[in-house]
Amino acid sequence: MKILLVRLSSMGDLIHTLPAIEDLARQCPDVELHWLCEAGFADIARLHPFVKKIHVMKWRQWRKHLFQAETWQEIGRLKQALRQEAFDFVLDSQGLIKSACFAKMAKFPIYGLDKNSAREGLAALAYAKTYTVPKGKNAVWRNRELFAQVFGYAMPETQVFGLTVPEAGRLKNLEQPYYAALHATSRDSKLWPVENWRALLQKLNE
């Protein structure tokens, strides 16, 4: 079985999808999984060894140059590449109108969340098959539950991210214990005030 996963962005959304992929790798090891995501987050998708191939889109760049021929040429090449893969189906785990539009590029049946479960209910109109996943749960649980329903297995009790971190990206010889502060975000509305960071770090250092 050959599947295209559509989870375009942002960084946190891709990370929250990794435990579902680990479940799939353990429960259905014969699945060939491809992943379509925003180019800027492709390295996150590459961290999981079960993902055989990454297909990248550049919507954050394309939307600024929609009237340029080069933009549509790149979109056309992406369409062609996806359609040549002959997927059994496309799984849109993001549940947005944008992700549904990119999922349709592949021209294969799309599976996804139903209108009451998706973040944008209209996205479900593009799906050949839909699944109900409660909104009240956290993102990791919802992704794992969606995958479990789509591929027909019971969600494992243990949550595992299954990452393979390249040697060059590993931090070594750090004194224990240590803290990692992740401050970056692609949206200003998610930024935390500097004084809050200072207060947190001072508290941790006590």
Regions found by a protein language model. Name each.
Residues 1-206:
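Catalytic machinery of carbohydrate-active enzymes
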